Design a protein with these regions (language model features):
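Catalytic domains of carbohydrate-active enzymes, especially glycoside hydrolases
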Residues: 74-95, 307-313
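Internal amphipathic alpha-helical repeat/solenoid segments
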Residues: 68-80, 101, 112
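A common structural microfeature
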Residues: 9-11, 72, 89
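Active-site region of glycoside hydrolase catalytic domains
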Residues: 1-53, 58-59, 102-104, 113-481
Length: 481
C-alpha cells in the first residue's frame, strides 16, 4: 500500500458480544437468554431449525454460551490486553437478560448494571472508547416463550425501557451505540435476531417482516431517547453486508442480483438510515408471499421512523456471494452463514466462507454512494482452527494475511471517498461462535485455553497477530508488514 489514508482519530479496536464471552449465565441475578438454550456444535443451526425445537435446555447437548470464556470474571485481564494492543475503542454488548432478567420488568437488576459499570470504567481507565450494541443476539428467553418474540408489539416497549435504562446510565461515558446487531440477518436465520424458528412462526414470512417493523420502531425510539439525553451521542444501525455479484451478464442474473441486494443488504438499511420504507417494499414482500396489509403498522410509527434516522451505519463484512438463477447444478459454497454459487476466483476459510477483501472495498463504496453516512466496520475477521505449540503460542500468519488485505481494502475505499469511522475485527479474543457454538472456530488475537466442551484453564495467550495488530494501531494503519 503506497499511501496511508486512515484519518486522525480513526477508531481501531475489536468486537465481541456478551453471550459469546461473558459466561456466568446464572450469576448476578441474570435471567435466561436465547443463547442459553442453543446447543453447541456444528449441528446447532440444524437443531434449532427443527419444528420440534422447544427453547429448553436438553441435557443431551452441551451449551458453550453458559461458560463463554468466563469474561465475567476475567474482564479486567482482557481489557488490559486490549489496552496493550492499543485499542482506541472496544465494541461489546449489554446482555438484556442481565439488566432485565425476564425482559418485561419495570425496574432493572442493579447487580447486572454494576457489572457493566465496571466494564465501562475499565475501558475508560485505558482511554478505550466503549462502542455498545444494545441488543446482540441475546434477547431474554421469557420474551420468546411468553410473548411470541418480536411479532408482539409489546416488545417495543420492553426494548424502549431497556434502551432508556442503559442510555441514561451511561450518557456521559458512552458516545457510540448500535440498536440491533445484524438486524437483516433474520432473512437467513431469524432465530438469532428475532427469536423465531420453525417451531414458533419463522415459516410464515409475514412474521419476519412484522418483527422487522417492530424492531425498526424500537430502534427509532432508542435514537430519539439517546439524542434527547445527550445530543452528542452517535447511535447507529448494524447490518450484515455481503457484496453480491451476478454470475454473468445475463439480464436475468443481473435482475436477480439487484433483487438479492434489495432483500439482503438494503431493505433494513434503507428504513433505518432514510427513515422510510423504500419504493420496492411492496414488490419485496410480494416475492415472499406477503401483502402490505399483513403488517400491523400505523402513521405514528412511520412518523417516528422518519424523525429518528440513525447517525451512522455499522456493519459486518465476512464474505461476498454470487447469484445465478439461469444454471442448474452449480457448485455452491459450504459456508454456514449464507449460501450461494461458488466463486472460482476466491479462496475460502476453514468454514467455507469465501474470502474477498476487494468485496469490502466495493461494500464501502456501495454504502457510501447510497447513504452518504459515516461507516463503521464493526465485524470482520477470519474464523480458523488455531494450533498452539507447547508454549501455547499460535503462529497465525493466515489471520494476519486476511486482516492485512482487508485493511488495505479499507484504506483504498477511504481514498475512493468513503467516510469510514473505524474498524473492530470480530472476536478480538477467542470466543464461542454464534453460528456453530464452537470454541474451535477462533478469530482472536488472544488465544483462550478452552475446548468445545468448555474444558481448559481459561488462561489467555497472545498470538502472533497480537503484536502485528498492535503495530497497525501504533502506526494508524501505515505499517501492515
Amino acid at each position: 500500500m503506497k499511501t496511508n489514508n486512515f484519518p486522525k482519530g480513526f477508531l481501531w479496536g475489536g468486537a465481541t458480544a456478551a453471550n459469546q464471552l461473558e459466561g456466568a449465565y446464572q450469576e448476578g441475578c441474570k435471567g435466561l437468554s436465547l443463547p442459553d438454550v442453543l446447543p453447541g456444535g456444528k449441528e446447532r443451526m440444524k437443531i434449532i431449525a427443527s419444528p420440534d425445537f422447544d427453547f429448553k435446555i436438553d441435557p443431551k447437548y452441551t451449551y458453550p454460551n453458559h461458560v463463554g470464556i468466563d469474561h465475567y470474571h476475567h474482564f479486567k485481564e482482557d481489557i488490559k490486553l486490549f489496552a496493550e494492543m492499543g485499542f482506541k475503542c472496544y465494541r461489546f454488548s449489554i446482555a438484556w437478560s442481565r439488566v432485565f432478567p425476564n425482559g418485561d420488568e419495570e425496574q432493572p437488576n442493579e447487580e447486572g448494571l454494576k457489572f457493566y459499570d465496571a466494564v465501562i470504567d475499565e475501558c475508560l481507565k485505558y482511554d478505550i472508547e466503549p462502542v455498545i450494541t444494545i441488543s446482540h443476539y441475546e434477547m431474554p428467553l421469557h420474551l420468546i416463550t411468553e410473548y411470541g418474540s418480536w411479532t408482539n408489539k409489546k416488545l417495543m416497549g420492553f426494548y424502549e425501557n431497556f434502551a432508556r435504562t442503559v442510555l441514561t446510565r451511561y450518557k456521559d461515558k458512552v458516545k457510540y451505540w448500535m440498536t440491533f446487531n445484524e438486524i437483516n440477518s433474520a432473512a437467513h436465520f431469524p432465530i438469532m435476531s428475532q427469536g423465531l424458528t420453525l417451531s414458533n412462526g419463522a415459516g410464515d414470512k409475514k412474521n419476519i417482516y412484522q418483527s422487522w417493523h417492530n424492531q425498526f420502531v424500537a430502534g427509532a425510539k432508542a435514537v430519539k431517547i439517546g439524542h434527547e439525553i445527550n445530543p452528542d451521542m452517535q447511535i447507529g444501525c448494524m447490518i450484515l453486508y455481503a457484496t453480491t455479484y451476478s454470475y454473468d451478464s445475463d439480464p436475468k442474473n443481473q435482475l436477480a442480483t439487484l433483487q438479492n441486494n434489495q432483500a439482503n443488504n438494503f431493505f433494513c438499511t434503507d428504513v433505518q438510515v432514510r427513515g422510510h420504507y423504500p419504493a420496492y417494499t411492496k414488490s419485496l414482500l410480494a416475492r415472499d408471499g406477503v401483502e402490505l396489509s399483513d403488517i400491523d403498522y400505523n402513521d405514528e410509527e412511520l412518523d417516528l421512523l422518519a424523525k429518528n434516522p440513525v447517525d451512522y451505519i455499522g456493519f459486518s463484512y465476512y464474505m461476498s456471494s454470487v447469484v445465478d438463477v439461469t444454471h442448474e447444478n452449480q457448485e455452491t459454497t459450504n459456508g454456514n452463514l449464507m449460501g450461494g454459487v461458488k466463486n472460482p476466483f476466491l479462496k475460502a476459510s476453514d468454514w467455507g466462507w469465501q474470502i474477498d477483501p476487494t468485496g469490502l472495498r466495493i461494500a464501502l463504496n456501495e454504502l457510501s454512494d447510497r447513504y452518504e453516512k459515516p461507516l463503521f466496520i464493526v465485524e470482520n475477521g477470519l474464523g480458523a482452527i488455531d494450533k498452539p505449540d507447547e508454549n501455547h503460542y499460535v503462529d497465525d500468519d493466515y489471520r494476519i494475511d486476511y486482516l492485512r488485505e482487508h485493511i488495505e481494502a479499507i484504506s483504498e475505499a477511504i481514498s475512493d471517498g468513503a467516510d469510514v469511522m473505524g474498524y473492530t475485527p470480530w472476536g478480538c479474543i477467542d470466543l464461542v461462535s454464534a453460528s456453530t457454538g464452537e470454541m474451535s472456530k477462533r478469530y482472536g488475537f488472544i488465544y483462550v485455553d478452552e475446548d468445545d466442551e468448555g474444558n481448559g484453564t481459561f488462561d489467555r495467550y497472545k498470538k502472533r497477530s497480537f503484536d502485528w495488530y498492535k503495530k497497525v494501531i501504533d502506526t494508524n494503519g501505515a505499517d501492515l508488514a
